[in-house]
UniProtKB/Swiss-Prot annotation:
Keyword Phosphoprotein part of the UniProt annotation: no
One Pfam family it belongs to: Dirigent
Gene3D superfamilies tied to this protein: Allene oxide cyclase-like (2.40.480.10)
Glycan attachment sites: N78, N136
Record's function text: Dirigent proteins impart stereoselectivity on the phenoxy radical-coupling reaction, yielding optically active lignans from two molecules of coniferyl alcohol in the biosynthesis of lignans, flavonolignans, and alkaloids and thus plays a central role in plant secondary metabolism.
Name of the gene encoding the protein in the UniProt record: DIR11
Identification of the protein by name: Dirigent protein 11
Organism name: Arabidopsis thaliana (Mouse-ear cress)
Subunit field text: Homodimer.
Listed GO biological process terms: phenylpropanoid biosynthetic process
GO cellular component: apoplast
Amino acid sequence: MLQITNMATPFLLLLLPLIFSTVLLLTITVTQSKPYSKTTPFQGNKPDKLTHLHFYFHDIISGDKPTTIRVAEAPGTNSSATVFGAVLIVDAPVTEGPELSSKEVGRAQGLYASTDMKTFGFTMVFNFVFTEGEFNGSTAALYGRNPILLEERELPIIGGTGDFRFARGYALPKTYKVVNIDAVVEYNVFIWH
């Protein structure tokens, strides 16, 4: 049979409360700590429909009332065949028809930058701000690469506000008309929201 000597008794009396305290502390810590994130079912705007928008974007760089202005450039931008490094800010009308006098349904606001050294390719960061019709007050956010010399192009819709909150989709821009350096671009936009 195991016997506890007189010397071992004080040691055990000190060790047992220490073990008990450690176990208790660990139990309290585990039960009181919370995870850094929590996933809950979203009860808000659930995706339920696909909307097709058709409009024209007026990119006016020349003249007295430009809608697009170059705000920055790299040292070699002007000698680059693709104006690589140019950054332009945009606040352009979005209309129902291809003529600037057509009914304005919104604005294209954002920027684009020449980001391709070999061909005309722009990285576009736009918000289509709708000011008329069913989606008045809503925006759709577009972000992507636009190789403007290609006839078929596709850019992602990555979100929005209002009716387009949590939206996703794509835009199909097609150059409708170019006069000097100004352009009218037809957009077919498909948004799941």
